[in-house]
């Protein structure tokens, strides 16, 4: 949902329907083990209170499908994923309560929706100032494994490794190259950077002419980190006729 929200915003901006400063949007996932909460934050299209009523409170109403229909002449290649309007509700499989705090890209107040999985919910004015949506899962006592960073990291990599929007999960230390005038025995410096768990631009999204042999080897190692030998060969086809497809092996 966070990916779709960001892709929608990018598409609206790209076709000039609205004047939007998209920037470099990132999806952030945060674990609050002490508070027993999981946060998913995006900088996408956001929702008004009316849109939350429409897209969240109506089961099986797909906002993605509606968007694709509205912009059917230009959005077919936008990469939007959702289709059935049901994915959000899986949150209640692990959460005893879910909150949505959202501010639309439109000039309207933010909204704050809360539900415990029953037919009852609250929808109030929010205090969010920045565009986008934050989902807060209050993790149930029977699903404590979803408060473990290793578990969340594993799931993010497994299901989002090649999502087209960068996904931040904490930070990491990055080793900087030694300076040219470094002396023997000098240790390289490190800096703290965002830990981006996915590759938003994998090899198959690029043209073969723009890739070198080392790019394919790097992609192979990314797919098979425990395989220490280089691939024997690679085949990369981009075919467009009545049906277009990309093939990389």
Task: Give residue ranges: language-model regions.
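GHKL (Bergerat-fold) ATPase N-terminal catalytic module, capturing the glycine-rich phosphate-binding loop
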Residues: 2-141, 145-146, 154, 161
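GHKL/Bergerat-fold ATPase module in large chromosome/replication-associated machines
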Residues: 80, 98-120, 140-144, 150-249
């Amino acid at each position: 949902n966070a990916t779709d929200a960001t892709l929608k915003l990018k598409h609206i901006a790209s076709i000039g329907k609205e004047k939007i400063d998209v920037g470099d949007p990132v999806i952030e996932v945060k674990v609050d083990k002490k508070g027993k909460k999981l946060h998913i934050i995006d900088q996408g299209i956001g929702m008004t209170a009316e849109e939350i009523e429409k897209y969240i409170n109506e089961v099986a109403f797909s906002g993605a499908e509606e968007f694709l229909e509205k912009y059917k002449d230009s959005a077919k290649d936008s990469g939007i994923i959702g289709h059935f309007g049901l994915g959000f509700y899986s949150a209640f499989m692990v959460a005893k309560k879910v909150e949505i705090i959202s501010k639309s890209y439109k000039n309207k107040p933010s909204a704050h929706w809360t539900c415990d999985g029953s037919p009852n919910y609250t929808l109030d004015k929010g205090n969010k100032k920045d565009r986008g949506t934050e989902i807060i899962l209050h993790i149930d006592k029977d699903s404590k494994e979803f408060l473990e960073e290793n578990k969340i990291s594993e799931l993010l990599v497994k299901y989002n490794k090649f999502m087209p929007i960068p996904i931040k999960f904490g930070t990491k230390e990055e080793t900087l190259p030694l300076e040219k005038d470094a002396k023997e025995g000098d240790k390289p410096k490190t800096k703290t950077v965002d830990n981006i768990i996915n590759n938003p631009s994998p090899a198959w999204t690029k043209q073969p002419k723009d890739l070198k042999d080392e790019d394919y080897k790097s992609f192979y190692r990314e797919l098979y980190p425990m395989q220490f030998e280089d691939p024997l060969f690679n085949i990369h086809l981009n075919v467009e006729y009545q049906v277009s497809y990309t093939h990389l092996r």
